[in-house]
């Protein structure tokens, strides 16, 4: 590995004791603080699973697939990274074991190892290190934060941990920092904090040759100085380098909690970087203050097929929250399983919703429930927002119930439909890598609701779809002067946005606007949708101080 020209610093974040400790949130929070200190920060996630990417994984297994501008299908943690940092990630920001092994095997087939026996060490570990270096170069980062997926001790993580162990030796002590997150359980019955799991986790990490310089302790109660000193002594760590990550009601509070513990000072001192810029994170303080003092409440019905696992729609939920906070409003997501929605209960389930959102999805299961929800929103004049598959089904619903095209459908659902209003252009037997992915241009119709919302005529949005509105049906839809294709991609002439002129707020988009929404910069479509939902029942529209 050639590191002579490498100027980036690297923070490697590992986790111990249990999974789902919040390593991604810790990484994003530290990144936010360091960015506010004036450094160019990027974050990378190393996932130890053998899948090439999460694109073909079940939402029930993995949650949301987050799509980057350059078309990578990635872990949902990248959504946290982008929202906390307000920086775009890339394909180099999420590396899986599958990608690493595929790359090494391809090189072996091409003869690039000159007949050597290909092994985990050095070939797999070298490939991992190259991917880390590439992320630093692609993003031109001063500081790269690298989150290692999984838990220390998992067999899948072993090559990644060995690679980051070697990394410090090759780039230098003051260019690498190891941060370990662990759970510190609190036994309520005994009213006692237990440190043994943390001790064992650090011991296991040290046995792999990695001595963490920072510990971040996840706990439901504050950890006193005596406990921290005990952990420091037994884990051979500076007591000043032990920080706590308390359970919080507001996710963004973690940024302030770590900042107030001065974690950035310890990091910058270790890296021997300038540490004289004073910051106060006032925008984030204002956001948290706003969330703690919300005046109104809006109810959004989210009609989906994966609602059992809310993480399947994580970015949509966060985007709705961003927009609601912009209007000084709390938000209640009413989770509605489209498989259980039918003509006898649709009114009961949707009547109290201020707005209805039908999100993405794949396959024929539970689509009729979604179509019923769309019809109800259209006929009852309830603000409606369709995203990706939600747009496609809005087209199907309109074709069936307004244009009376009997049997109209998507060819994804019915290949023999007499009216294929939604079709697929790319035909491939494999599911992986065949989607239209990444950021594409969309031109907006002048004097349309879309143009009014965006306040511009050309936008770029991220996509993840295989099917699209059939161009040969567009003129038929627009004949009745209600249905409007208000956004289209000029390169492929694809319908990107539809809206109904005679409805208070009925819009559906082929792209995924939720991937571009930020806590301090809500996406314009979500803002407009939430505003319409608030207005539906005459609720007070008052922008927060964030606007």
Swiss-Prot record:
Record-annotated residues binding CTP?
Answer: 19, 154-156, 194-199, 230
> Residues in the active site?
388 (nucleophile), 512, 514
Q: Report residues binding UTP.
A: 19, 194-199, 230
One GO CC annotation: cytosol
Any idea which UniProt keywords this protein has?
Answer: ATP-binding, Glutamine amidotransferase, Ligase, Magnesium, Metal-binding, Nucleotide-binding, Pyrimidine biosynthesis
The Gene Ontology biological process annotation of the record reads: 'de novo' CTP biosynthetic process; pyrimidine nucleobase biosynthetic process
* Subunit comment: Homotetramer.
| NCBIfam families associated with the record | PRK05380.1, PyrG
Annotated protein name in UniProt: CTP synthase
Q: Which organism is it from?
A: Phytoplasma australiense
